Regions:
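Non-catalytic, surface beta->alpha helical segment in thiol-disulfide oxidoreductase systems
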Residues: 735-756
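Structural micro-motif
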Residues: 723-732
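Long insertion/accessory domains within large nucleic-acid-processing enzymes
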Residues: 604-657
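Conserved catalytic cores of very large enzyme subunits
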Residues: 47-51, 57-427, 448, 454-608, ...
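Thiol-based oxidoreductase modules, predominantly thioredoxin-like and allied folds used
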Residues: 706-718
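Charged, amphipathic alpha-helical regulatory modules used
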Residues: 1-63, 425
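Conserved phosphate/anionic-ligand binding catalytic regions in large, soluble enzymes, centered on
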Residues: 178, 182, 226, 425-442, ...
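Local sequence-structure signature of Cys/Sec-based thiol-disulfide redox active-site neighborhoods
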Residues: 670-704
Length: 756
C-alpha cells in the first residue's frame, strides 16, 4: 500500500477513491514485472465492475409481462400498428431483451447514457436489424423467390396471380428481417407486361390485385402486425424503362415496357378501385402505402383513372405524392441508387422512394433522433447550443457506425438470409440522423423565445439545418458511410422525449397546451394549431423541408373528405406546381361504423345507428384509429387545427422561389468539365460491378454494332470526373470536341436503335 500511496499524490482530506487505488495497483504490478498477477487483477476488476452494473442490466421478467398484460406501460401503445394481443406480448418481451442487449453489450456508456437520459432517441432498439429497405421488383420477376439452402424456392412468376402471391410472401419474409418499411418501386410498370402477355381481362387483373392488397394487410409480421409495405407507382412509363424489353417469367419479351401503357392503366385502375372499396366494413386498407409520381408530363385530363386516383385521395387520403415538377428529384432516382457513383464523399444524397419507402436496393440501417428542445433549454446562447448539438451528433453518428458494423457482421454470418440473397450489402443504405421539436427549441432558446411562425425562428432553424448537413458531410468523410438528415416521423419519440424533459425540467416548454399531455412537434413543423390556411403553412415549410434529405413530408390535414375528385386534383396540382417540397399528402379525417361503413369527418358515434365508430386520422405517416395512438399523439390530434381549403389563399411567388428545369438524362456540353482531348470520335460506356442494367446497355450497343470502350467507373475516377458521370450505365459520345452524355440503359438503347 505504501508503494501505491507514494505514487499517487491525489489524496485529499485523507480520502482516496476505490478506482484510484485500483488504478495505482495495476500500474505498480505492471512496473514491478508481475505481469500474470496484473492480468488476473485486471480481469478481477472487470468482473467486479460487471457485478456492480448488474442491477442496471437485469430485467424483471414479472414487471415486463405485467406491464403489457395490464397495460400499465405507455409503450403498449408505442406503435399504433401493434394491437394488444399475444403476438404483441411476445414482441414486447423480446424487444425488452434486445434493447437491453444493444444498450449494455454493444453501445458504449456514452451512447447508452445519451439514450437513457433522453438526450437522443435510438430508434428500433427492440430489433437486432436494420431499419428500412427498398427492393428491386425487377429482380424478383427475373429470379423468383427463394435461393436459400433448405428453404422452398419458387421459379420466376409467369402469370400475374403468381407474381402477386410472390410479392406478398416476399414482403412478409423481408419484414421479419427488418424493423421498418419495405418497398417496391415502379409497381404498375413492372406488372403491366404480365397483363399483356396473358391478355388478361380487367376482372382477372382486379382479382389478382385484390389478392395482393388483402395479403399485405394480414397481420403476419412479428407483433401481430401486417408488413409495413410501400409501393411507388409511375402512372406513366418512365423514360429509363420505356425502351427496355419487358420481363415475364424471368425472360425478356418481344415488346418493351413502353408498349404496355394500356395494361399499366388496368393495373392502376384495379389497385385504386380496391383501395376505394375498402374491406368488408368499408375500412380503408392500411397497406400498401402508395406513392404517385407527379411529373411534368402528368395527364391532368378527366380520364377514368384520374377520377379514381383523386377520389381515393379525397375520401381516404391514402396516397403520397412525389413532386417531380419543382423538387430536385428525378423519377428514375428510385431505381438508380445502386448505380450512383460517389464522386464526392461530402455530397449528401436524397433517400428516394417516398416518405416511408426506399428506392431499389437502398434504405436506412438505423435512425437516431436528437432532442432539440432540451439542447435549447440548457443553452445560455447560440454558441453553447451548437457545441451541444455537435456533441450529440457525434454520439449519434458513432452509434450508427457501430450498428452498421454489427448488422453487417450478422448479415455475413447468415442472420438475415433473404436480405443476403437479394441485397448482399448495406453499402447503399444510409445512417440516418433526425431531429424533433425545432418549434419548441426556438421557444426555449433564450435568444429567440418565439415559435416557427416568426421569421427569427425560421432563420435560426435554417442555420441549424445547414449546420447539421455540414456535420453529416464530415461523418461521411470520417466513416465512409452514407449519412442523411431526416425529418423524423417520431410517432413515439415525440411523447417519450417530452415526457422525460418535463420530469427533469418542469419549466421546459413543450408543444402541449397548459396541463395537457406533453409532446413535441415533429422535426421543424409548425405548431399544429397555427393556421387553417394551407398555403400560409406551405410558404413557411417549403423553405425548411427542402433542407432535409429524407423523411420530409407536408400533410394537408383536413377535417373531412373533399367534396369531389376535382377538388383533390386541383389541390395536388397547385402544390406540385408552386412548391419545391418533395412529398405531400391530402389527409382527411374519417370514421368507420361497423354497420354503416364510411363516415366523413370525426364522428365517435354513428349518426345513423348510434353505435360507437372508429375515428381514423394520419399518425406520423399512415392512418390508424385514434384510440390506438399513444397519449402524446392523442394530445396533438386534439390540438390540431385542420386546413380550410375554401378559405386558403395562395400568395404571389417570385420566379426564384422555384427551381429551374432539371437536367435531362441526355445532355450535350462543350464546357471545361466535359471537354474532350483531341477531335477523334470515341464512345465510352461507364459501368460498375454492382450495376444491374449495365449488361443490358452493352447488349444494345453490340446489337447495333456500335463500337465502344468499357470504362470501370469505380477504377477510373479521373475519367468519371472529367466527363461528369454520376451513375452507371452512362454512355459518353465524343464527336468533334463535343461531348454527349446518355444516362441509364433506356436512353442508351434508344440511341442504339436510332443508329440501326
Amino acid at each position: 500500500m505504501y508503494q501505491v500511496r507514494k505514487r499517487d499524490g491525489k489524496i485529499a482530506d485523507s480520502l482516496i477513491s476505490v478506482e484510484d487505488i485500483q488504478d495505482s495497483v495495476e500500474s505498480v504490478l505492471i512496473q514491478a514485472g508481475y505481469d500474470d498477477v496484473a492480468k488476473g487483477y485486471i480481469l478481477y476488476r472487470k468482473q467486479r465492475e460487471k457485478i456492480r452494473n448488474l442491477n442496471s442490466t437485469l430485467l424483471d421478467y414479472k414487471e415486463i409481462v405485467d406491464s403489457y398484460v395490464k397495460v400499465t406501460d405507455w409503450r403498449v401503445k408505442e406503435n399504433s400498428t401493434v394491437t394488444y394481443s399475444v403476438g404483441g406480448l411476445i414482441l414486447s418481451n423480446s424487444g425488452a431483451i434486445t434493447a437491453n442487449y444493444w444498450l449494455s453489450e454493444i453501445y458504449d456508456d456514452e451512447i447508452g447514457k445519451a439514450h437513457k437520459n433522453a438526450d437522443i432517441h435510438i430508434h428500433d432498439l427492440s430489433m437486432l436489424t436494420g431499419y428500412c429497405a427498398g427492393w428491386s421488383l425487377k429482380q424478383l420477376i427475373q429470379e423468383g423467390l427463394g435461393g436459400i439452402p433448405g428453404r422452398i424456392t419458387s421459379a420466376p412468376a409467369r402469370h400475374l396471380s403468381v407474381l402477386c402471391n410472390q410479392m406478398v410472401n416476399f414482403l412478409g419474409i423481408m419484414q421479419n428481417e427488418w424493423a421498418g418499411a419495405q418497398a417496391f418501386s415502379s409497381f404498375d410498370t413492372y406488372l403491366a407486361p404480365f397483363v399483356k402477355a396473358d391478355r388478361l381481362t380487367y376482372d382477372e387483373v382486379k382479382k389478382c390485385i385484390e389478392s395482393f392488397i388483402y395479403g399485405v394487410n394480414i397481420p403476419s409480421r412479428w407483433g401481430t402486425q401486417a408488413p409495413f409495405s410501400n409501393i411507388t407507382l409511375d402512372w406513366t412509363i418512365p423514360d429509363d424503362l420505356k425502351n427496355l424489353p419487358a420481363i415475364v417469367g424471368g425472360k425478356e419479351m418481344d415488346f418493351t415496357y413502353g408498349d404496355c401503357k394500356e395494361e399499366m392503366d388496368m393495373v392502376n385502375r384495379a389497385f385504386i378501385e380496391t383501395m376505394i372499396e375498402g374491406d368488408a366494413e368499408g375500412r380503408g386498407f392500411q397497406y400498401p402505402i402508395p406513392t404517385y409520381s407527379i411529373t411534368r408530363d402528368f395527364d391532368w385530363s378527366e380520364t377514368e383513372n384520374n377520377k379514381l386516383l383523386f377520389e381515393m385521395t379525397a375520401k381516404y387520403g391514402t396516397p403520397y405524392f412525389s413532386n417531380y415538377i419543382n423538387s430536385d428529384m428525378e423519377p428514375g432516382d428510385v431505381r438508380s441508387m445502386c448505380c450512383r457513383l460517389r464522386l464526392d464523399l461530402r455530397e449528401l444524397r436524397k433517400k428516394s422512394g417516398g416518405f416511408f419507402g426506399s428506392g431499389e436496393s437502398t434504405g436506412s440501417v438505423g435512425v437516431v433522433t436528437i432532442n432539440m428542445p432540451r439542447i435549447a433549454y440548457l443553452s445560455e446562447n447560440e454558441e453553447q447550443f451548437y457545441k451541444k448539438i455537435d456533441r450529440l451528433m457525434d454520439i449519434s453518428a458513432r452509434s450508427l457506425h457501430i450498428k452498421r458494423t454489427v448488422i453487417t457482421k450478422l448479415l455475413n454470418e447468415g442472420l438475415y438470409p433473404y436480405t443476403k440473397r437479394y441485397l448482399g450489402t448495406f453499402e447503399n443504405h444510409f445512417s440516418t440522423i433526425g431531429l424533433i421539436g425545432m418549434n419548441e427549441a426556438c421557444l426555449n432558446a433564450k435568444w429567440i423565445r418565439k415559435d416557427l411562425t416568426h421569421s427569427e425562428a425560421q432563420a435560426f432553424t435554417k442555420d441549424v439545418l445547414n449546420h447539421m448537413r455540414e456535420r453529416l458531410s464530415d461523418y461521411q468523410e470520417m466513416y465512409g458511410d452514407l449519412y442523411n438528415l431526416e425529418a423524423t416521423p417520431a410517432e413515439s419519440t415525440t411523447y417519450r422525449l417530452a415526457k422525460h424533459d418535463v420530469a427533469q425540467f418542469p419549466d421546459i416548454i413543450t408543444a402541449a397546451e397548459p396541463n395537457g399531455t406533453p409532446y413535441y412537434t415533429n422535426s421543424s413543423h409548425l405548431p399544429v394549431g397555427y393556421t387553417d390556411d394551407v398555403f400560409e403553412a406551405l410558404d413557411i415549410q417549403d423553405e425548411l423541408q427542402t433542407l432535409y434529405t429524407s423523411g420530409t413530408v407536408f400533410h394537408t390535414f383536413l377535417g373531412e373528405k373533399l367534396p369531389n375528385w376535382k377538388a383533390a386534383a386541383a389541390l395536388v396540382r397547385k402544390i406540385a406546381e408552386n412548391y419545391r417540397l418533395p412529398y405531400y399528402t391530402i389527409s382527411p379525417t374519417y370514421s368507420i361504423c361497423r354497420n354503416h361503413g364510411y363516415l366523413s369527418g370525426e364522428q365517435h358515434k354513428c349518426p345513423y345507428c348510434g353505435e360507437e365508430a372508429e375515428v381514423y386520422s394520419r399518425i406520423t405517416g399512415y392512418y390508424r384509429p385514434i384510440k390506438n395512438w399513444n397519449d402524446g399523439k392523442t394530445q396533438e390530434f386534439k390540438e390540431r387545427k385542420v386546413y380550410n381549403i375554401t378559405n386558403s389563399r395562395m400568395r404571389p411567388k417570385t420566379p426564384s422561389a422555384l427551381t429551374a428545369d432539371p437536367v435531362s438524362a441526355a445532355e450535350t456540353a462543350s464546357g471545361a468539365a466535359l471537354s474532350a482531348d483531341g477531335r477523334s470520335p470515341r464512345t465510352f460506356l461507364f459501368t460498375t460491378s454492382t450495376c444491374p442494367n449495365c449488361h443490358a446497355a452493352a447488349a444494345s450497343l453490340e446489337k447495333a454494332h456500335i463500337p465502344y470502350e468499357v470504362i470501370d467507373a469505380e477504377k477510373n475516377w479521373d475519367l468519371v470526373q472529367k466527363y461528369g458521370v454520376m451513375q452507371a450505365p452512362t454512355l459518353i459520345l465524343v464527336r468533334d470536341g463535343q461531348v454527349t452524355k446518355l444516362a441509364n440503359a433506356s436512353n442508351i438503347k434508344a440511341y442504339a436503335e436510332r443508329k440501326v
